[in-house]
Amino acid sequence: MALLKVKFNQKKRVKLAQGLWLMNWFSVFAGIIVFSMGLFLKIELRKRSEVMDNSESHFVPNSLILMGILSCAFNGFAGKICYDSLDPAKFAKWKPLLKPYLALCFFFNILLFFVALICFLMRGSLESTLAQGLKNSMKFYRDTDTPGRCFMKKTIDMLQIEFKCCGNNGFKDWFEIQWISNRYLDFSSKEVKDRIKSNVDGRYLVDGVPFSCCNPSSPRPCIQYQVTNNSAHYSYDYQTEELNLWGRGCREALLHYYSSMMSSMGAVVLLVWLFEMSVMVGLRLLHTSLESIANPEDPECESEGWILENSLKDTLKSALESLKKIGKFNQVEAGAEGAEGEEAGKTPAITTVS
């Protein structure tokens, strides 16, 4: 029994073809939106590439760009088929291509669905990329005189100001690295010497943070040095008082920014996928309704359209049998080639009589 069998007359077939033509051009527009989202996400990720550990995060935007291009190509082609299906003479040239095209559409929709899922599932990978990337970037904050790293101070400062964050996981991350360049340290000072000697790696560590960690909304002037020294500041207790530094780490801030963006994009891609599935189903109904016309010379006659010629169970069974036959045929061919090779390798023995 056919799955989703529908009866069509000429009027219904024309309406279906016209509706599908319109839907395909809407799908082309949806493909442009998916392409644009991928391009936008790629640009946003490139802006912060210095604070990311690897290029794996670009898999999502690259996938969106590819799906957008394929969507425009497939739906533009389908729109042409639907337009020509109103004319039997024009439709005849497309008829042999419809089955392979529908198979390609099916695989395209599977890929589109997986891309939508990846948009929701990339959070874990993105988190580890940001955590390691920010950690490495903060180490280079002081290298303002080193070629290739001189821009890192500005990058980190602008990042902390824009996203209202401080450090990787919090402001205390700055206590663990030397973020002040040796160029600006007075090595004749006893305090500087003592701090460097007290550190195993010979680094100048302070309980201070860069100016970009300061919250301008705080009524108190920014305390960015001796943050944990209560006696260094009047009426101050860093453990109980709300600090005038950003409390959120930049990893969390960036992760929230990109995750919310990708989740929104994933929702849009899912909607596009549902629309693409409805277009594919409609195109299959149009294809089968035109193929099942009893008398091609009488376009007014009724016909039947369906999604699957047999039930889902029977279709899967026949598909598995076809795959088994292909596998057996390949084995037989391989065996025949092997036998031919063995025969060719045998050379006839020639006996000479003296």
Swiss-Prot record:
Protein's membrane topology: Multi-pass membrane protein
Protein name: Peripherin-2
Gene coding for it: PRPH2
Cytoplasmic side: 1-24, 81-99, 291-354
Source organism, top-level taxon: Eukaryota
GO molecular-function terms, A-Z: protein homodimerization activity
A Pfam family assignment: Tetraspanin
PANTHER family, per the entry: PERIPHERIN-2 (PTHR19282:SF202), TETRASPANIN (PTHR19282)
Residue ranges annotated as Lumenal topological domain: 44-61, 124-264
Broad class of where this protein is predominantly found: membrane
Family: Belongs to the PRPH2/ROM1 family.
Organism name: Gallus gallus
Region Disordered: start-end pairs: 335-354
